[in-house]
Design a protein with these regions (language model features):
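Phosphate/nucleotide-binding beta-alpha loop and adjacent structural elements of enzyme active sites
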Residues: 2-242
Length: 242
């Protein structure tokens, strides 16, 4: 088992954005058995989400800060189950990878925020922690370095959905992972118009000792969502209005 895991990690690294990777992943997905489960996301978020949506086919996700199409993705496991959706990332090179291996999806190179003012997008050397948050960039500077700074004009999540969400399409899942700017992305959505069933959102500041004082929790509680789970650093919410 350990030997297989080592080979799989090397395969992920070598072919992470390829059609071959997608094909092999589908085969392995079909061969999953009890006690051996494949995860693609960074902290196993996709296993939590798959468990919630178990048996649901042809769902729809919106993935903000999508990063890579396979490795580290919260939504690739759902894609293999027949889902489709909208992927958004500020790195055009990463979005090109989505175009290659996730043909059913709509994949966009955009920055999402609650402000339309021009921002600097800091692209990390390993592509994993790119951000527009100067505070996050400063917080992680001892562990990651940034290779490029790109000037971009953000759009709100509502604008993205107005333009690209298929007509009458229900959003089953909204996942947000944008390295320190997650709250701003969240509040840029019009929840009266677009109401995801489940929300997975990253928050490095969350504490069980101060749930009601947490900005993300307070915002979603006010919009009739309930906190369903927490797996560092991600919060999982479900709407009460279904």
């Amino acid at each position: 088992m350990m030997f297989f895991k080592l080979i799989w990690r090397r395969f992920l690294k070598s072919y992470q954005n390829s059609r071959l990777h997608c094909f092999v992943s589908k085969i392995l997905r079909a061969l999953e058995f009890e006690g051996f489960i494949i995860t693609y996301s960074q902290f196993g978020e996709d296993m939590i989400l798959e468990n919630y949506f178990r048996g649901r086919r042809e769902g729809f996700y919106v993935d903000i800060g999508a990063n890579r199409p396979i490795q580290g993705s919260n939504t690739f496991k759902l894609y293999l189950n027949g889902w489709r959706g909208i992927n958004v990332d500020g790195n055009q090179q990463l979005i090109n990878g989505f175009h290659k291996v996730r043909k059913r999806d709509i994949s966009l190179c955009e920055i999402v925020s609650n402000s339309s003012e021009q921002v600097s997008f800091f692209v990390s050397e390993d592509d994993r922690v790119s951000t527009i948050s100067k505070e996050f960039k400063e917080w992680i500077k001892d562990h990651r370095s940034y290779a490029q700074e790109v000037t971009m004009i953000p759009k709100s999540l509502t604008q993205i959905l107005d333009q690209y969400l298929p007509l009458s399409q229900k959003i089953d899942l909204l996942t947000i992972d944008v390295e320190g700017h997650d709250y701003e992305v969240l509040i840029s959505n019009n929840f009266d118009k677009y109401r995801p069933e489940v929300i997975c959102i990253e928050d490095h500041t969350f504490s069980f000792n101060n749930i009601n004082g947490n900005a993300i929790c307070s915002f979603l509680f006010d919009r009739n969502y309930e906190l369903q789970g927490y797996a560092y650093p991600n919060l999982f919410f479900k709407t009460k209005l279904i």
